Amino acid sequence: MGKKLQFTELDQYLFGQGTNYDIYRKLGAHPDTQNRKKGVYFAVWAPNAQAVSVIGEFNEWDTEKNPMKKVGPIGVYETFVPGAKIGQLYKFYITGAHGEELYKADPYANAAEMRPGTASRITDITNYKWKDDTWMKNRENFDPDTSAMSIYEVHPGSWMKHPQTAEDEDGFYSYRELAPKLAQYVKKMGYTHVELMGIAEHPFDGSWGYQVTGYYAPPSRYGTPQDFKYLVDYLHRQKIGIILDWVPAHFPKDAHGLVNFDGTAVYEHADPRQGEHPDWGTKIYNYGRPEVKNFLIANALYWVEECHVDGLRVDAVASMLYLDYGKKDGEWIANKYGGNKNLEAIEFFKHLNTVVLGRNHGTVMIAEESTAWPMVTGKAEDDGLGFSLKWNMGWMNDFLEYMKLDPYFRKFNHNKMTFSMTYAYSEKYVLVLSHDEVVHLKCSMLEKMPGELDDKFKNLKAGYTFMFGHPGKKLLFMGQDFGQLREWSEARELDWYLLGEENHQKLQQYVSDLLHIYRKYPALYGADNDPSAFEWINANDGDRSIFSFVRKSPTRRNNILIVCNFTPVARPDYRVGVPKKKQYKLIMDEQGLLPKGKVFKAEKKNCDNREFSFAYPLEAYGVGIFTY
């Protein structure tokens, strides 16, 4: 065999240590030329198999034509098949530890058969010519701590669809078709990043991509791996970052997938008390097994290094950290200290984040962690988990509870909007209004708001203004920036026709104005983790449900003052205490951007325990964003 594609002793050693970070360049299916014959090199890890062969379109799915040879004690099997070609389907035929016959998709496949088919597809991931050199070079200097990040969360299959036909029931846009449309929208709105859901092969559309069978394969619903790279490339050339949802917490029990891969629990724990998620009906990875850890960490590196993705949002982190997550007494096994912490998962996260961020400066690792686990964004060397950012689920829950209330009752729940500032600097946060909040009868963002339709729009504008003023990066799920009325469904596109109505059009423009102001003023993003850069002007005006606060820039120039009114009562002479005797320029109100601005001069009138103040005519559900 050629030297390049051969599973060497060094490969075996590193894989056994869990540190063969380029393992996906060896395991899987790779076009190669050996002994002057073109074909494909196949390799698979099946440590307890009795025998393995590769079957596919190149050998008429004959289980005896291409047996694979076991390489060393670690349990990797390899072979070279002359004449096998790019585009052909294949599987591994495994004689299991107990003699069972198993037909498995390739865990390291870079492409898969279109569902409901379950085979893997031969492809060449090395033949894409990137054109995003400028972006990749600049990325090395990107620092999430001091940079603007406004993320547009997108499900690619339902963002926008073709009209459905008999030949194309799904109506999906391909990655290449999606690229210019998505880039144009994101750029026009003013988002900095796109976060894509479901970009790993999954058999069931209704899982939204959270039950993965092909970790190294972009879903074939939307095209090839090369097409996916084109999407990333295109976004980068338009100066848009891309983050992927990534699901290392669990995997489904589909027979062609990872479950009982060689007739034994290879990727999962054998004991159901450790290896089963009762809530989700899925399997839990064995994070203590080096080869499994290697599979996942190399997968993260595959997306970041091979596909140029700028970061990963790690799903369901809490379910990995707690051994008793979603389980009753008797359904879980304590750790060696008798506790409920998953020590192996903790070490996995430290290893993962250290390697990914250490090898790829300027990328981000984001945790969806729903508990108060400490130091999620703390450095691994300081016993933190090493993530760059964490979703702020506490803020989200309090914010949504407050916003749903009839304005009369908000005064009794004023602390729901102020409480988050008591822990805002305990982690590095992203404020999220994600897909999870607009499904399962939770209503769309607009429909959550109280009152008549007109009031709903006003409430939402005020709420978004508060969100964009609050410390933390921002994330909005698709459709919520123009007031999608229906809940989200993966089976249909967003209700774009709503933009034919003035209210929806105005909301979309308003959100775009917020996005552009957010990016323009470092006060709103440059000191997110500096407690001295935030100051309440009045956090206690509960009777009138008005909040006012200051965001300071890292240089303390061009600071921002924000006032938000969450009742339908106008306050024509609302007095706002201010830090200094200066001019305060109104740059945005509830109608949107004010291109020329309007100046308010501070007077020597005591208000909000401050020497200076000015009167601002605050409309019903009105807001004011000022620079000074």
Give, region by region, the residue ranges found by the protein language model.
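Carbohydrate-interacting/catalytic domains
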Residues: 1-148, 176-186, 190, 454-457, ...
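Short glycine-biased active-site loop of nucleotidyltransferases that positions the nucleotide triphosphate
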Residues: 69, 204-209, 253-260, 377, ...
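Short catalytic/ligand-binding loop motif for oxyanion handling, primarily in non-cytosolic enzymes
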Residues: 101-102, 160-162, 202-205, 250-253, ...
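Substrate-binding/active-site clefts of carbohydrate-active enzymes
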Residues: 111-113, 133-149, 155-341, 610, ...
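The feature represents the membrane-entry module of six-transmembrane cation channels
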Residues: 154, 319-320, 369, 420
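A short acidic, glycine-rich active-site loop
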Residues: 217-221, 336-343, 452-454, 498-505
